[in-house]
Amino acid sequence: MNLKEKTRALFAEIFGYPATHTIQAPGRVNLIGEHTDYNDGFVLPCAIDYQTVISCAPRDDRTVRVIAADYDNQVDEFSLDAPIVTHDSQQWSNYVRGVVKHLQQRNNAFGGVDMVISGNVPQGAGLSSSASLEVAVGTVFQQLYHLPLDGAQIALNGQEAENQFVGCNCGIMDQLISALGKKDHALLIDCRTLGAKAVSMPKGVAVVIINSNFKRTLVGSEYNTRREQCETGARFFQQPALRDVSLEAFNAVASELDPVVAKRVRHVLSENARTVEAASALEKGDLQRMGQLMAESHASMRDDFEITVPQIDTLVDIVKATIGDQGGVRMTGGGFGGCVVALIPEDLVPAVQQAVAQQYEAKTGIKETFYVCKPSQGAGQC
């Protein structure tokens, strides 16, 4: 039974009438462009075929009833006429409540909804299960009540909910790719203008995500430190963001900067340039050049931004040794654990899976999780 069938069956069973709509919003993986989003730079993610699915129907009153199928059918119920506050014990509820609260501030021409939610985006793997949930909930209200909101507005609404209601800092990339993703394409996103250009993926290439299953511990504190270091760099150049600094300008005065800040700045500037070039390499089907850019990106994250860990570097080395120059691999996500992403010809996937299975656990003592994904469509009815 797929997620649509599961949520529709549960909806009818619990609410006693059939759902009118089923909405999905995908998770994502970022192919290249790491820690560039909050520097107003470029990212190149694609939506993946793991998603949050919501079966739903409008109500004729002002109540929102939500069932979380993946949390033992826990229930949340709240009114649109009372102030929406955080739920004491159910963290998942706060993503739903936050999205609805921020939607009210944008366009409150909507009424109550019944919904049943289920998803298969792996949690804690850095594949944006939370953004997928936020975009799915926003799309439910937009579709049921014909709200005049586009994908970018639904994405911004989800980001606001996560930053201000849930209380977790994030850039805009995760929500934007979930809302705007396009089947068989990646999206080159300008994080300053929110402009997005669809970039076709070469045929016969698999998007492979391998979770190191190394538990991230430093990610919050170190993430904030990196942001501060980038802001320090932008102030040094008297620019609003590192997006506005050229590599030439940086190289001319790099020695005057604090050495650690200089390394952080160099990563962001070089990563932005790599990301823009990667989009054109993908479009041309030049997997060899894409692989070189991904390798440079990983080295920059390891040596200049210092956000990789030995387990991740080991995974990258195993994959690279298997594929040679027929594709690319790098860490993806915030760092300090999490996943690597690889672009690999489909016929090489079994060899990569076998090499990782034979070597990774032997070298690290941890068993990996292996996902083979397809670049998928963004949020909408399913």
From Swiss-Prot:
Catalytic site:
174
Question: Catalysed reaction per UniProt?
Answer: alpha-D-galactose + ATP = alpha-D-galactose 1-phosphate + ADP + H(+)
PROSITE patterns attached here?
Answer: GALACTOKINASE, GHMP_KINASES_ATP
Locate the coiled-coil region(s) and give their ranges. none
Q: Pathway of this protein?
A: Carbohydrate metabolism; galactose metabolism
Q: Which SUPFAM superfamilies match?
A: GHMP Kinase, C-terminal domain, Ribosomal protein S5 domain 2-like
Q: Name the residues that bind substrate.
A: 34-37, 223
Site, as annotated: Transition state stabilizer? 28
Q: Where in the cell is it found?
A: Cytoplasm
* Alphabetized UniProt keyword annotations: ATP-binding, Carbohydrate metabolism, Cytoplasm, Galactose metabolism, Kinase, Magnesium, Metal-binding, Nucleotide-binding, Transferase
Q: Which GO terms describe its cellular component?
A: cytosol
Q: Where mainly found? A: cytoplasm
**Chain positions recorded as Mg(2+) binding sites:** 130, 162
- Listed Gene3D superfamilies: 3.30.230.10, GHMP kinase, C-terminal domain
Which top EC class is given?
Answer: transferase
Per the record, the GO terms for biological process are: galactose metabolic process
User: What GO MF terms are annotated?
Assistant: ATP binding; galactokinase activity; magnesium ion binding
Binding-site list for ATP: 124-130
Query: So which domain of life are we looking at?
Result: Bacteria
EC assignment: the record states 2.7.1.6
Summary of the function given for this chain in its UniProt record: Catalyzes the transfer of the gamma-phosphate of ATP to D-galactose to form alpha-D-galactose-1-phosphate (Gal-1-P).
Q: Which family does it belong to?
A: Belongs to the GHMP kinase family. GalK subfamily.
Query: Record's PANTHER family?
Result: GALACTOKINASE-RELATED (PTHR10457:SF7), MEVALONATE KINASE/GALACTOKINASE (PTHR10457)
HAMAP family per the record?
A: Galactokinase
- The name of this protein is Galactokinase
Organism of origin is Salmonella dublin (strain CT_02021853)
